[in-house]
């Protein structure tokens, strides 16, 4: 799904609509960490989100290092392959688990926010082409490095793609957290296994 979602598209959305913020109003972020209903599974899930943000930031820093001449191309290539594979593979697996297992169960817990999980799944479809473009830019740059070709243009394209994805991904992860964590806090007996 792409920008046909209008104002709810990741490209345009500045946050969840008010109708989907009812539970985060009851359970604001400030209370999550110490809340008795924040399960080990939720802590793990939030940690995964942090890791995705950190991996993307590391990819951007490495790319900027190459552009600035602070990174030797072969060292950069090894880091790009390692970080890129972890980021893309883990994020796609994470989204798959959410779409097939997690969201359908959460959707049934509170009808007031049920459509929010459809929105999050649509986000995954909107993010997927950005992930594909990132992989293509990274692979093109890796090929240039292997061939000993100049890297500035390829690194610039990779940086631009990382910046595009960063906005989409941060908006999605933040909105996802604002839906998922409060519904779990409000429903401590929810079966997510």
Residue positions per predicted region:
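Small-residue-biased structural context
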Residues: 1-193
